[in-house]
């Protein structure tokens, strides 16, 4: 895969798919600028070469055409602050204003196009729409790993209209780090899987059983495993239709010599509430009417030990309902163990979504090896699927 380091952008207009799908508050201020911040080095390389940048992205999920709350103009102030130069805006992505402003762009200038998803054609992967986008630039750059698993017009289809195309620094780093874990993991290798549902993680767990030495299961999905083993899990979250599958995964882990670590105990609550009454209980005997909302102290101890003795760590999904203070300890302690292992030379990849949010919230983003920006894209990559956005750059 070619990266932007292989290209000189002098006098060229780069059409760049970025991921500016960032959260906004009620006054339309960006509340988390990580995705914008991540792509700044890509933009700087192109501008320093003497090129210009045309940025395209989606924001949110607009239903019926343009909606002000989903306008990318709300990201301009943040982008200008981080980039240290003015950013022009086109109130469309394929209309007359976009075409004129792109054509008049001088070296060193930046133009941001309006939200791609204001057009239904974007998510449909419409070829004519992609061709119109392609007319705006000379070279195509994709720096949006978070949407690489979608064959949309701007992430995949548009690439066919360019002789020169390349991955930006974010895209290249994402693919390199995922490859490192998938193909060249130093042993012992532990995968930590959390989150609510087994159904979201079946494929990745099956793939990882061929790669890892240890598999840690936490979060809501662990109760489906305990119920499958005949335990009493009270009214903890259980996917009744996945009990056989959970048993099957336990057997597969055994057959492949993978040590499967389920949480021994839980912090249980009498209701799903930040102010609920809580106790610690063994996971095989949770009281009727109570539910497990975090891993317990014994589980923390076992998990931490496994993590701290590992050389490669992949973490995807929290250990409990970490948005609520009473149920955040498990996720926090696992994060601390990952940081400790990393400081001793382990390679740690944090897989997007909630795990990335938890690591950021704890101030640990710089203390792990890599935090992925792509939740769904990373999962699909580890499931062994081809990512259309990555394939389009080859």
Residues covered by each model-derived region:
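Active-site loop-to-helix "anion-binding N-cap" substructures in soluble metabolic enzymes
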Residues: 1-394
